[in-house]
Amino acid sequence: MQQALTLARSAASIGEVPIAALLVRDGIVIAEAHNLRETKQDPTAHAEVIAIREGARQTNSWRLIDTTLYVTLEPCTMCIGAIVLARIPRLVFGATDPKAGACGSIMNIPPEPRLNHRVEVVEGVCAEDSQALLQDFFRRLRRESAQRETP
């Protein structure tokens, strides 16, 4: 998760929301990504989706069995949907997301019995660091916005 936090910091340095994901198989990172939504002007350019796409390319398979996805923030509905569809068996995330989290915060998709795949979820790993990174980023954005608006 420390590696994901480092990657999230690099996202913040280019004006992206500091969220990052690492896809790991047998202890080796096979894909990593941070959010690129602002850079690409693409609403689907979340760290999880980008890492899953890269993992599928690296393994030449959309079935990412025997992997773990590490994410600095609780995935949204789109991202947990991609995780389920990619058959990723394990998700580890840092901070919870009370506004958009779909792994227990506003809804809880992973244990949904009607889905054809279940994801084991471990939450709260480096949660304080993940949350602090996000809070600092948005605090800085608000401060910069206020400075631009001040005549």
Task: Please provide the spans of the model-predicted regions.
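Zinc-dependent deaminase
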Residues: 1-11, 78, 82-151
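Small-residue (primarily alanine) positions within well-ordered alpha-helices
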Residues: 4, 8-11, 21, 31, ...
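Short, basic and Ser/Thr-rich N-terminal targeting/leader segments
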Residues: 15-19, 63-65
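Short beta-strand scaffold segments in enzyme catalytic cores
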Residues: 19-27
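Short beta->alpha transition motifs characteristic of CBS
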Residues: 30-37
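Residues that line or immediately flank small-molecule/substrate-binding pockets and catalytic motifs
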Residues: 37, 71, 95
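A short, polar/charged loop-to-alpha-helix boundary motif
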Residues: 39-49
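Helix-adjacent hinge/juxtasegments
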Residues: 41, 52-82, 86
